[in-house]
């Protein structure tokens, strides 16, 4: 089973892809996506969306987990 975990953020968004195996969980990919502060909000969201789509296309996760935002 492949799991995509997302730590949401507008400026910095964390992503990790884990593979659940009988012997335990294995980290197969992680990154921090950083949008440019000078770009308009819609352009920043578009960038983050495109990058997440690339990750989904490459790793084909079975499950998505999104961390709850705390303010």
Q: Where do the model's predicted regions map?
A:
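Phosphate- and other anionic-substrate recognition elements at nucleic-acid/protein interfaces
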Residues: 1-71
């Amino acid at each position: 089973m492949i799991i995509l975990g997302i730590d949401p953020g507008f400026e910095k968004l964390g992503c990790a892809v884990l593979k659940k195996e009988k012997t335990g969980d294995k980290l197969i990919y992680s990154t921090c996506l950083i949008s440019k502060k000078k770009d308009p909000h819609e352009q920043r969201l578009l960038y983050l969306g495109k990058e997440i789509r690339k990750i989904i296309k490459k790793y084909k996760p079975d499950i998505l987990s999104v961390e709850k935002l705390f303010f």
